C-alpha cells in the first residue's frame, strides 16, 4: 500500500472532495448553497443529536445577540428548501462545519465535524422504503466510483475494489434477531465484516427488547425510514459509518416521535410550528462525512491525518509514538 506524504495527502483530500461532491450533486440533482456556522438558539434549527450533547453557545458583549454553533444542518436544510422555493425532485447541499464539544475523541471521532449536508424535495407518496433504498443506491454508486478513481490515481489499495458491487440492506430489528447476545456496535461490526457495505435501517426506532439501536433526534428523520451507510475498513478492521440519512418526518410522525421521546416542548419552536402548520415540504436528506470519507479512501490510521482539529494531549502523544502525522 502506498504511503502518501503530508503534501500528497492534502492534494488527495482536495481531489476526493471535488470528485465526490460534483458526482453527488449530479446524481441527486442538488444545488450548492451557503450554510450558517451559528444560528439562533430558539429557532429549533439546531440538531439535538442524541439529546445530551450540548451545543457551543455564546452571547455577544457588543450586540447582545445569543447564538449556538450548529451540530448539524438537518432541520436547517428542510427549512431552506422552502425558503429557496426548491422545485420537486431538486435539492441542495452544503459544506457543513460544526462543533460537537461533547464528542468522545478517538481515531474516527473529532470535536470538529465536516460533512456534505444534503436535502432533496420529494412528495408525500415517496415516503416508503423503496424510495429510501433507491436513494441509498445512488449515493453508494457515487461512493464506489470515487473509490475506484482514487485508487487508480494514488494506488492506495492492493486490490482494485475496496467495496462490493452492491450495498446490503438490514434493519436494526433484523440485526438484533441475528445477534441477540451482542450490543449494537458489535452487531454493526459483524454485519460489516460479512457484507463490507451495509445500510443499517430504522435507527432510533424502539426494538423488541424495548431499546433503540442508537439514538436519533425525533424531529427530522422518520425512525422507520432512515439509516446509516456503513462500510468495513480493512485498515482498522472496524465498521465505519460514512453517512446518516433518512426520509424526514411529516406532521403525524413528528407528533408521534416527540410524544414517544417526551419532548413535546419542541412544538413551541419556530421550525416545529412551521412543520405542523404545513409550511415545510416533504424531503429526504442526510450528511456524508468529508473527513471520514477521506480517511477511508486514503486508508489512514486516524481522522486527524485528513482533518485539522484539536486533540487531547494523550491522543497527540499516542499519534506521535505511532508515527501518525496529525494536520
Curated annotation (Swiss-Prot):
Q: Which UniProt keywords apply?
A: Amino-acid biosynthesis, Asparagine biosynthesis, ATP-binding, Cytoplasm, Ligase, Nucleotide-binding
InterPro entries (alphabetical): aa-tRNA-synth_II (IPR006195), aa-tRNA-synth_II/BPL/LPL (IPR045864), AsnA (IPR004618)
Going by the entry's taxonomy, the superkingdom of the source organism is recorded as Bacteria
Documented EC number(s): 6.3.1.1
The GO cellular component terms are:
cytosol
Whether Nucleotide-binding counts among this entry's keywords is yes
Instruction: Write one Pfam family the protein is assigned to.
Output: AsnA
Where would you find this protein in the cell? Cytoplasm
Question: Predominant location of this chain?
Answer: cytoplasm
Q: Does the keyword Nucleotide-binding apply?
A: yes
In which pathway does this enzyme or protein participate?
Amino-acid biosynthesis; L-asparagine biosynthesis; L-asparagine from L-aspartate (ammonia route): step 1/1
Q: Name one GO biological process term.
A: L-asparagine biosynthetic process
- GO MF assignments: aspartate-ammonia ligase activity; ATP binding
> Known catalysed reaction(s)?
L-aspartate + NH4(+) + ATP = L-asparagine + AMP + diphosphate + H(+)
Q: Which family does it belong to?
A: Belongs to the class-II aminoacyl-tRNA synthetase family. AsnA subfamily.
**Name of the protein described by the UniProt record:** Aspartate--ammonia ligase
Q: Which organism is it from?
A: Mycoplasmoides gallisepticum (strain R(low / passage 15 / clone 2))
| Originating gene | asnA
Amino acid at each position: 500500500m502506498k504511503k502518501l506524504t503530508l503534501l500528497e495527502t492534502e492534494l488527495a483530500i482536495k481531489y476526493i472532495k471535488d470528485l465526490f461532491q460534483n458526482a453527488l450533486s449530479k446524481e441527486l440533482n442538488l444545488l450548492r448553497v451557503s450554510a450558517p456556522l451559528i444560528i439562533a438558539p430558539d429557532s429549533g434549527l439546531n440538531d439535538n443529536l442524541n439529546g445530551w450533547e450540548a451545543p457551543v453557545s455564546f452571547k455577544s458583549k457588543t450586540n447582545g445577540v445569543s447564538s449556538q454553533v450548529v451540530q448539524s444542518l438537518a432541520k436547517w436544510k428542510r427549512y431552506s428548501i422552502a425558503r429557496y422555493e426548491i422545485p420537486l425532485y431538486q435539492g441542495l447541499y452544503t459544506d457543513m462545519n460544526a462543533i460537537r464539544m461533547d464528542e468522545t475523541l478517538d481515531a474516527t471521532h473529532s470535536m470538529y465535524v465536516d460533512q456534505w449536508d444534503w436535502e432533496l424535495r420529494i412528495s408525500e407518496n415517496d415516503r416508503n422504503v423503496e424510495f429510501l433504498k433507491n436513494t441509498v443506491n445512488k449515493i453508494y454508486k457515487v461512493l464506489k466510483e470515487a473509490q475506484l478513481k482514487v485508487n487508480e490515481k494514488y494506488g492506495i489499495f492492493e486490490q482494485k475494489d475496496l467495496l462490493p458491487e452492491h450495498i446490503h440492506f438490514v434493519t436494526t430489528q433484523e440485526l438484533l434477531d441475528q445477534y441477540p447476545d451482542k450490543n449494537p456496535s458489535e452487531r454493526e461490526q459483524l454485519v460489516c465484516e460479512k457484507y463490507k457495505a451495509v445500510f443499517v435501517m430504522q435507527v432510533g426506532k424502539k426494538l423488541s427488547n424495548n431499546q433503540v439501536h442508537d439514538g436519533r433526534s425525533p424531529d427530522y428523520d422518520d425512525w422507520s425510514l432512515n439509516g446509516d451507510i456503513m462500510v468495513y475498513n480493512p485498515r482498522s478492521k472496524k465498521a465505519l459509518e460514512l453517512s446518516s440519512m433518512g426520509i424526514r418526518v411529516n406532521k403525524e410522525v413528528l407528533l408521534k416521535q416527540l410524544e414517544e421521546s417526551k419532548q413535546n416542548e419542541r412544538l413551541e419552536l419556530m421550525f416545529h410550528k412551521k412543520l405542523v402548520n404545513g409550511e415545510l415540504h416533504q424531503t429526504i436528506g442526510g450528511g456524508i462525512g468529508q473527513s471520514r470519507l477521506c480517511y477511508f479512501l486514503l486508508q489512514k490510521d486516524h481522522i486527524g491525518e485528513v482533518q485539522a482539529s484539536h486533540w487531547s494531549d494523550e491522543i497527540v502523544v499516542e499519534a506521535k509514538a505511532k508515527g501518525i502525522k496529525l494536520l
